[in-house]
A protein has these predicted regions:
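Short, Lys/Arg-rich N-terminal segment immediately upstream of the first membrane anchor
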Residues: 1-4
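Mixed-charge, polar/low-complexity N-terminal
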Residues: 6, 30, 98-100
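Hydrophobic membrane-insertion alpha-helices, especially the h-region
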Residues: 6-24
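Generic detection of intrinsically disordered/low-complexity segments and helix-coil linkers/edges
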Residues: 14-18, 34, 104, 156
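Alpha-helical segments in soluble extracytoplasmic regions
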Residues: 39-125, 135-170
């Protein structure tokens, strides 16, 4: 009986070790988000870089009083212009043709997430215009901020200029 128990324990340990060797050494490393469309990625990266430059021109690093409605309105104006640049970017990316089925399935989902993120940014503009200041709050998807999902897709497809801006993080 002891021999059977010992043999069972050895088999279980070897199986667990083999599973970890496979997981860390041999399992595929393909990202679920990777669409393998270099032409689409190149065009998207270029358009996102252009939008990032437009937003950089809007940057205002001055401090502002969170109790000053005029200062909040000024900040809202800047964010609104940045949002406009992002919306135009997303509209342009939507027009770029994707060459494969996986991309045709995933890119619209990514763009929909980006539009949700932009809706959150628009809500923040409305909050500032109302004279109230609070931290930027974004939609959570399965407990993850939507900007992280958007950024993960951008990183996995090597379109880092398309990572959402962190200009509202306080």
């Amino acid at each position: 009986m002891r021999h059977v128990a010992r043999l069972t324990i050895i088999i279980v340990c070897v199986a667990i070790a083999a599973m970890w060797v496979y997981a860390f050494g041999f399992s595929p490393r393909e990202s679920i988000n990777k669409i393998y469309d270099e032409e689409w990625a190149s065009q998207a990266e270029s358009r996102c870089a252009e939008a990032r430059e437009q937003r950089a021109d809007l940057s205002d690093l001055s401090t502002f009083n969170i109790n000053d409605a005029t200062a909040l309105a000024k900040r809202a104006d800047i964010i609104e212009r940045a949002n406009s640049s992002l919306k135009s970017m997303i509209d342009d990316i939507e027009q770029i043709l994707v060459s494969n089925d996986k991309g045709r399935a995933l890119v619209p989902l990514w763009l929909a997430d980006y539009r949700t993120y932009l809706d959150d940014r628009d809500d923040y503009v409305d909050l500032l215009r109302s004279g109230n200041f609070n931290r930027f709050s974004e939609t959570q998807v399965e407990g993850v901020p939507i900007s992280e999902r958007i950024g993960k897709f951008a990183k996995d497809n090597e379109i880092r200029a398309c990572i959402p801006p962190f200009d509202l993080v306080t």
